[in-house]
Curated annotation (Swiss-Prot):
S-S pairs: none
Protein name, entry field: Protein SchA
Pfam family, one: ABM
Domain ABM: start-end pairs: 24-115
UniProt-listed InterPro entries: ABM_dom, Dimeric_a/b-barrel, SchA_CurD-like
Transmembrane segments: none
Upper taxonomic lineage: Bacteria, Bacillati, Actinomycetota, Actinomycetes, Kitasatosporales
Family statement drawn from the similarity comment of this UniProt entry: Belongs to the SchA/CurD family.
């Protein structure tokens, strides 16, 4: 058994993090069209060199089912989750895999942190140098978190608020193992953020939601108001839009103290200076762990969503967030405040300057997003 010397320690109350230093194994299952096996092999060979040059990529394999020649998979290994996510949610990714599109009926992607591996002794040193292996698995509750974000035309904000505040909720049951748990919608200026929680299979839930007539009606009503051109009847246009809109969850922490009837949910918007988004997301994840771990903190759970230079935190608090602005912002420590001051684009928030102890209540007001809807399924 090969075990890395670099061992990360993730608290038991963190069911999700991409910041633990683990390598990532991605399995992409492909259902290809009958008779296109040779074309799939040729397409893979044409794109493989480009994928191999992506930062963080270690290796990949193209595999064909022993039993069914139309079932294939691509398995790849990456140095870290942030590097993989940066590529997977990019337009560059869509362009690279385009040669496969004509031959694929459907896909299913699964992403895993590498916990342990067995290797020959002579390979041990090389494997040990590639990322951390975790001392124990993360413990979770089978809930997957994801978000999408997009901007609407400034003169359409009022109409968009009406559409998103009054839509009919879709059927929460997806299948025997998957159901929608919670959907929270927020607005900051003309930016919409939709955060969803799913018990079970996220991809199955997203496909289920997209097929629901009430959701299709809402999306059709929104299309003329969105700044990015999109045609949801065109699979390529829809794929491009939702790739650009993806705002993946990169960290989640829960207190384990339970939630009472006065629990409130708020969303906070953290625009970063160019290139500072990853560092800001790491800082807020680290500080969020400390805040939730404090028995005196009102924060009972928080999730960090990150893409490029945009970070959004979803925070559940026992009582009003205004009672503890530093804890809610995850900026309650002097060192964290100083680091955030270097990373945050305070001007984009309309703030006079970087956050400091005295200005935290005002900074919370600047960062707080406008809630539109927050819907939970009855069984959740």
């Amino acid at each position: 058994m090969t075990v890395s010397a670099a061992v990360s320690t993730v608290p038991d109350r963190v069911p999700l993090t991409v910041f633990d230093g683990s390598r990532v194994r991605v399995v992409l299952m492909l259902d290809i069209r009958d008779g296109t096996q040779a074309e799939v092999l040729d397409a893979y060979e044409r794109m493989s060199d480009r994928v191999a040059a992506v930062p963080g990529h270690i290796s990949d394999q193209l595999c064909q089912s022993l039993e069914n020649p139309t079932q294939w998979l691509i398995t790849s290994e990456w140095e870290s989750a942030p590097e993989f996510l940066a590529w997977a949610n990019s337009e560059e990714h869509l362009e690279m895999v385009r040669p496969l599109e004509p031959y694929v009926r459907g896909t299913h992607s699964m992403r895993y942190s590498v916990l342990r591996e067995t290797a020959e002794e002579r390979a041990g040193a090389g494997a040990a140098a590639r990322g951390a292996l975790q001392p124990r698995p993360r413990i979770g509750d089978n809930v997957v978190r994801h978000a999408v974000t997009y901007t609407v035309k400034p003169d359409s904000v009022t109409e968009v608020v009406k559409i998103l505040s009054a839509y009919t909720s879709p059927e929460v049951r997806v299948d025997d193992t998957t159901r929608l748990v919670r959907t929270s919608l927020f607005l900051y200026g003309n930016r919409v953020v939709r955060a969803i929680e799913v018990r079970g299979d996220l991809q199955a839930a997203l496909r289920h939601v997209a097929r629901q007539p009430e959701v299709r009606a809402v999306e059709e009503a929104l299309t003329p108001h969105i700044e990015q051109d999109r045609d949801l009847t065109d699979p390529r246009s829809a794929r491009l839009f939702f790739t650009r809109a993806a705002l993946p969850a990169v960290h989640h922490v829960v207190s384990g103290r339970g939630t009472g009837g006065d629990t409130q949910r708020c969303a906070l918007y953290y625009p970063a200076h160019p290139g500072a988004g990853p560092a800001l997301a790491r800082l807020l994840a680290r500080q969020g762990e400390a805040t939730v771990g404090d028995p005196g903190s009102p924060v009972v759970a928080c999730t960090v969503f990150h893409r490029d230079d945009l970070v959004v935190r979803l925070v559940d608090t026992a009582g009003a967030p205004e009672r503890a602005p530093g804890a809610v912002l995850a900026l309650h420590e002097p060192d964290a405040l100083a680091e955030a001051g270097r990373l945050l684009d305070a001007a984009a928030l309309g703030a006079d300057g970087p956050p400091d102890d005295r200005a935290l209540p005002t900074f919370l007001a600047h960062a707080r997003m406008r809630p539109l809807t927050d819907r939970q399924s009855p069984a959740s």
